[in-house]
């Protein structure tokens, strides 16, 4: 687990300079008993395991994704950081959905996802089959040809149990457009 080692100075910067409040941990059950990286410094760890890509449509996954977006609606959560084990698949999926909901262009959200290529898992790109399947299913099941990916993600999150007021709070917390 050397790839996730936080230096003492890095921890100090996160706590003292960035005033980090929350660690959102997407890793699975094998990491359930591990303490949060900065728990001793008062940073709350919230662990909700996620699955990536086209696995996001199961009832269990939708409940978990809904829980994350409900958390994003809480101002007290911020500033926060989120992570999985490698920083590519689960993190990439959650951040893609978040950015898309917030109105980031598809081109920019996909480009940001492609930056997960720098993780320990290697090349990730827009034609990576699981990612492409996720986008295809979002549009097939939650949008129409005339609608955007943003609309499809919004509808997906409503199906995940996230209320309209919570989605509005996510926007208010993370953009200057509210």
Where are each of the predicted segments found?
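Cys-dependent protein tyrosine phosphatase-like superfamily
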Residues: 1-81, 93-178
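Ser/Thr-glycine-rich phosphate-binding loops at phosphate-binding pockets of nucleotides
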Residues: 86, 90-91
């Amino acid at each position: 687990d050397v790839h996730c080692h936080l230096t003492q100075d890095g921890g100090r910067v996160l706590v003292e300079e960035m005033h980090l409040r929350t660690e959102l941990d997407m890793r699975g059950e094998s990491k359930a008993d591990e303490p949060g990286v900065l728990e001793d410094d008062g940073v709350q760890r919230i662990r909700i395991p996620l699955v990536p890509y086209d696995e996001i449509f199961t009832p269990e996954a939708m409940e978990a994704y809904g829980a994350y977006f409900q958390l994003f609606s809480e101002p007290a959560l911020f500033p926060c950081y989120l992570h999985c084990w490698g920083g590519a698949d689960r993190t990439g999926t959650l951040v893609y959905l978040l950015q898309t909901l917030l109105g980031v262009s598809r081109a920019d959200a996909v480009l940001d996802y492609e930056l997960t290529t720098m993780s320990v898992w290697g090349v990730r790109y827009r034609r990576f089959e699981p990612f492409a399947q996720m986008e295809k299913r979002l549009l097939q099941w939650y949008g129409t040809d005339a609608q955007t990916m943003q609309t499809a993600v919004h509808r997906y999150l409503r199906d995940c149990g996230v209320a309209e007021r919570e989605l509005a709070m996510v926007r208010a917390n993370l953009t200057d457009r509210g």
